[in-house]
Amino acid sequence: MAPREIQGPRAQEVPTTSDAERAINQGPADVLLCHDHPSLGYRLKGLPIPEADERTSAQVRRLLARVVEAICPKLVVHGHWHHAYETERNGISIKGLDCDNTDRTVALLDLDTLEVEDWDLSDPARRR
């Protein structure tokens, strides 16, 4: 089933099948930055969303899982759920970013090591 057409400002959050194919055709990648998380055998609990949004999100997660399977990233970073967490599935590190203006909403990625460090927004030295 193809994702339904989304209209309005949320449309930019929903990748299309052609977006996924373009990512897959680019070949392997170490990092996947995306809005939602791919379906990799886990669900975030306690975060209710409207049923229509859940259906669209489930379609997007399945589409992203196809991309992950094809490009084999070592790290996936996303922010859709506004819930900070880290997990690992099938050898892939997954980092969810928190809500805007919270301590875990911004992270630094070391491209050499693929280590992710939360950016401390309360540190005046980092507010430049």
Q: Where do the protein language model's features map onto the residues?
A:
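Active-site-proximal loop/helix segment associated with metal-binding centers of metalloenzymes
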Residues: M1-A58
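A short, acidic, amphipathic alpha-helical segment used as a generic capping/interface helix at domain edges
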Residues: Q59-E69
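A structural signal for short, well-ordered beta-strand segments and their strand-loop junctions
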Residues: V31-H35, V77-H78, G96
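Active-site environment of divalent metal-dependent phosphoester hydrolases
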Residues: P38-R43, V67, I71-E88, N101-T105
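Noncatalytic linker/hinge segments flanking ATPase motor cores
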Residues: S18-D19, P73-H78, V116-S122
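Short, well-ordered alpha-helix to beta-strand connector turns
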Residues: A29, P73, G91-I92
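Binuclear metal-dependent phosphoesterase catalytic core
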Residues: H83-R128
